[in-house]
Amino acid sequence: MEDFVRQCFNPMIVELAEKAMKEYGEDPKIETNKFAAICTHLEVCFMYSDFHFINELGESVIIESGDPNALLKHRFEIIEGRDRTMAWTVVNSICNTTRAEKPKFLPDLYDYKENRFVEIGVTRREVHIYYLEKANKIKSEKTHIHIFSFTGEEMATKADYTLDEESRARIKTRLFTIRQEMASRGLWDSFVSPREAKRQLKKDLKSQGRCAGLPITVSHRTSPALKILESMWMDSNRTAALRVSFLKCPKK
């Protein structure tokens, strides 16, 4: 799984996710499923915001090539990907400027067009189950929830999918491709099933001769690493390097 992640995700995303996990004592070489999940969530958040701008009339526009006009403003503020202190600073600034209700938990994005925070979810399970879990945790009608699955399904608050169909299709296609590539490498079952993941982890550690002295456990809690990615990448260019193109999985 680790090799798959390094081959199939943008190197910047891999580096951010790896550093985030290590800062919380999580080893990407051991908790490889979590490593893959963090990278996937990051990529979806970036893809969600990619190419979407607001013009001088306040209208949402899509620009996919070249540098956007100076009069255009990014439609989405990316909160996911920043360290917690900076993320809360951004949230507080948004709330002070827009008078939006401050969320109890760090959201992933802020939508300047709809004036609302957005929580992005990527699930290996049924979308409605994951949606309800998110909604129960957030407990706020002010934060918009949008869930994607690896099977092409999606679910959003009040069936408001925010993005145009083509933009959402781009995300769904990427997730489906990730699933297919995992399956072709025999990784999908362990990625979906905690029991299979634990069995695979034991097998991998044994094959590496690293079982001695190591606890054989797989954490299923939401990783705090998802919220502590290094803010140094979030400069005024708004992760321009990520907007160029995402690496495609190499063929077997």
UniProtKB/Swiss-Prot annotation:
Site (Important for efficient shutoff activity and nuclear localization): residue numbering on this chain: R195, K198, R199
GO MF terms held by the record: RNA binding
UniProt-annotated site: Important for efficient shutoff activity, residues: K202, K203, K206
Subcellular localization, as worded in the UniProt entry: Host cytoplasm; Host nucleus
Top-rank lineage group of the source organism: Viruses
Pfam families listed in its UniProt record: Flu_PA (PF00603)
Catalytic machinery residues: E80, D108
Keyword Ribonucleoprotein among record annotations: no
GO biological process per UniProt: viral RNA genome replication; viral translational frameshifting
Keyword match NAD: no
Keywords noted in UniProt: Decay of host mRNAs by virus, Eukaryotic host gene expression shutoff by virus, Host cytoplasm, Host gene expression shutoff by virus, Host mRNA suppression by virus, Host nucleus, Host-virus interaction
Function in brief: Plays a major role in the shutoff of the host protein expression by cleaving mRNAs probably via an endonuclease activity. This host shutoff allows the virus to escape from the host antiviral response. Hijacks host RNA splicing machinery to selectively target host RNAs containing introns for destruction. This may explain the preferential degradation of RNAs that have undergone co- or post-transcriptional processing.
Similarity-based family: Belongs to the influenza viruses PA-X family.
Domain remark in the UniProt entry: The probable endonuclease active site in the N-terminus and the basic amino acid cluster in the C-terminus are important for the shutoff activity. The C-terminus acts as a nuclear localization signal. The C-terminus is recruited to host protein complexes involved in nuclear Pol II RNA processing.
Protein name: Protein PA-X
Organism in which the protein naturally occurs: Influenza A virus (strain A/Equine/Tennessee/5/1986 H3N8)
Taxonomic classification: Viruses, Riboviria, Orthornavirae, Negarnaviricota, Polyploviricotina
Gene assigned in the entry: PA
